[in-house]
Amino acid sequence: MITVSPAEPRDAAAIAALLEDLGRFYDATESEPLDRRIGQINEAIFTSPPAAYALLARDGDQVAGLAAYSFLWPAAGATRSLYLKELYVPDAYRRQGVGKLLMHAIFETAATLGCSRVEWTTDTGNIAAQAFYAELGVPTHRSKVFYRVEDTGSGLGSIVRGQT
């Protein structure tokens, strides 16, 4: 039986493994050493206050999926929204309802905490993810344009200084 619960500090290595698998899914070519990734996970999720949160789907002792999220403010009025950064289910658990369980847990978390909405993105080429969200009955919003600035080694500050 698959269960969903908040991640705990003892889960950091399992989260690191899922994120490594996620990176391979997106054809990432670089990976940081495991101890550094675990340190980043602990710093992001298990400090007070946390910068991010994670829900894990479990099949007994096996981790069957991850939903990583943060809160954004302001949303509608002075409310906040829950931003789902990653929903990831390894191949072995796909098409078994794990993603739906994680999404329902995300929606329940948002409702319990008084969020006015849940938001997320998916890659334009990830047709399977788009079909999954459509099956959930979630409409696509095309009213926003997404921007991203990445640190390419010269530091994000170079953009602020006009050195792009």
Predicted regions and their residues:
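A short beta-loop-alpha structural element at the N-terminal edge
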Residues: 3-17
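Conserved GNAT-fold acetyl-CoA-binding loop/helix
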Residues: 16-43
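A short helix-loop-beta-strand connector motif used in the catalytic cores of GNAT acetyltransferases and
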Residues: 44-55, 83
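Conserved beta-strand in the GNAT
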Residues: 56, 62-71, 88
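A conserved beta-turn-beta hairpin within the catalytic core of GNAT-like acetyltransferases
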Residues: 73-84, 94, 141-142
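Conserved acetyl-CoA-binding loop-helix of GNAT-fold acetyltransferases
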Residues: 89, 95-108, 131, 135
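Conserved GNAT acetyl-CoA-binding A-motif
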Residues: 111-121
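Conserved beta-strand-loop-alpha-helix junction that forms the acyl-donor binding cleft
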Residues: 119-129, 148-151
